[in-house]
Structure formats: C-alpha cells, structure tokens
C-alpha cells in the first residue's frame, strides 16, 4: 500500500468514526464534546513530546488541562487569540528566510493553537454541527489532494526551509480539486452549492497554513512526526494540523454572523 493510500484509508476510517459520533448525539447529546476533549488531550500529549525536558512537557499538559475549567463566556477571547497566533506564525514563515523558535515560543504558540481550536470546535458544534463535520472532511481531502498533485506534478517548492514537501503545483491542485469535491458532496450533506465551493476555496489555504506552521514548529523542536499512531500520517497532529488551524477562523465567522442568518 502506498503512502497516499494509507493517508486516504486512515482519513476515511477516522471520518466514519466522526460521522457515527455526530449522529449519536440523539442518544448522547454531549458525545461530540467528549470526543473533542479526547482529541485535544491526544494532540496536547503529542505536542508535549516536542519539549526536551519532562518538566516543560508536564507543565504544557497541566496548562491545557487547567484551561478546560475556563468558563464558556470567555471562549470568544480564545478564538480571537487562536486566529491571531496562526496569522502571526504563518506571516513569520513567509517573511523570514529560515525562522526558528525557542522552547518558550513553542510552548506558548502550542497552547494558543490547541486550546482555542478545542473551544472553537465546541462553538461550531453548538451553532452548526454539520460545519464541524464539513471542516474535517474538507481538510482531509485538501491534504490528500495537495499530496497527490505535489507527488505527481510538483516542481516548484514553496517553502524549502520550513516545509520542503509543499509545492506550488500541489497547492494549486488542492485549490481546484477541493471546491469540486465539496460541490459534489453538497447534495449529500444538503449544503448550498455556491457556499460549498466558496468553503472549499477558503479551507485549502487554511489547511496549507496549518500544515506549514506545524512543520515549522516540529523543525524548531527537531521532530519529524508527532508520533507513529496513524498510518500514512504520523500522529494526530500530523492528521489534524489543517483542522486545528481552520476551526478558530470558522468559529470567529459563526460568532459574527447575524442571529437570523
């Protein structure tokens, strides 16, 4: 089985599990929230392994755990912080030739990416559960499409010092293929066609940014993969990096839509 086939198979299995979980809300209304908690803890554990000392790893995990006690009325602040940290890190990668991060930056950046993504998932689920599923499906497809087109046609590397596997051809291929895929999917998920196409055009660069930023952090920490739990991907961070980046932006959008939208 090729690496692409492994990536697609692993992604499909996890998406089926997610679909079952979301549909199980009729019997257990809080099961998606529990799932988000488990995923956040798994991602946090993998991220904690980026640190060279056990004390920093433990402190990071405790910080994430203690943050779950934050009252929900403060979630919007974390969503905004999450969007800002993603934008600042991605711009840093674009503007500087060979950026790097120290342990303190890795610590605070990780916290301001992972916890805001967790609360964003809760906000999205409570507002429009279908969007949570759509984000994960679209990111998984965009990631696989970029990998396929990059392997098949890739010639021009976009960020050789940060993420040498990312090519212009792969990004363009995903940017074209993802809206088409979501347009076909829109009939199955009862989604507006034009909305699905626009969504696909937005999700592709967000997924790309998530992948690149986590590659930057892993390179700074001298880590190749977050773990080896998921065939074809590596770990949960490697699988969900695009979703972790995308969720705060869509949560921010939902928070600012008119009530009767």
Locate each region found by the language model.
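Interfacial loop-to-transmembrane junctions
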Residues: 55, 220-243
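Juxtamembrane boundary at the C-terminal end of a transmembrane helix
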Residues: 252-261
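Membrane-embedded alpha-helical segments of transport systems
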Residues: 142-145, 172, 210, 237-245
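C-terminal transmembrane helix pair
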Residues: 218, 243-250
């Amino acid at each position: 089985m090729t690496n692409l086939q492994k990536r697609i198979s692993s992604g499909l299995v996890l998406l089926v599990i997610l679909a079952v979980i979301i549909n199980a809300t009729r019997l257990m209304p809080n099961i998606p929230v529990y799932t988000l908690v488990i995923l956040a803890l798994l991602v946090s554990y993998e991220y904690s392994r980026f640190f060279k000392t056990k004390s920093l790893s433990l402190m990071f995990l405790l910080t994430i755990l203690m943050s779950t006690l934050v009252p929900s009325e403060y979630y919007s602040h974390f969503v905004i912080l999450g969007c800002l940290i993603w934008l600042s890190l991605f711009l840093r990668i674009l503007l500087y030739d060979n950026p790097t991060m120290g342990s303190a930056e890795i610590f605070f950046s990780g916290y301001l990416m992972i916890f805001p993504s967790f609360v964003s998932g809760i906000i999205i689920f409570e507002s429009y559960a279908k969007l949570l599923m759509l984000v994960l499906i679209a990111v998984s497809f965009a990631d696989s499409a970029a990998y396929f087109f990059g392997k098949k046609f890739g010639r021009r590397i976009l960020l050789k010092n940060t993420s040498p596997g990312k090519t212009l051809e792969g990004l363009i291929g995903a940017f074209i293929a993802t809206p088409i895929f979501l347009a076909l999917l829109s009939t199955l998920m009862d989604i507006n066609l034009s909305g699905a196409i626009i969504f696909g055009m937005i999700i592709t660069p967000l997924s790309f940014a998530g992948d690149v930023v986590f590659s930057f952090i892993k390179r700074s920490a001298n880590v190749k993969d977050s773990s080896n739990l998921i065939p074809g991907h590596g770990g949960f961070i490697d699988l969900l990096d695009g979703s972790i980046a995308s969720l705060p932006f869509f949560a921010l959008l939902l928070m600012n839509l008119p009530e009767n939208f």
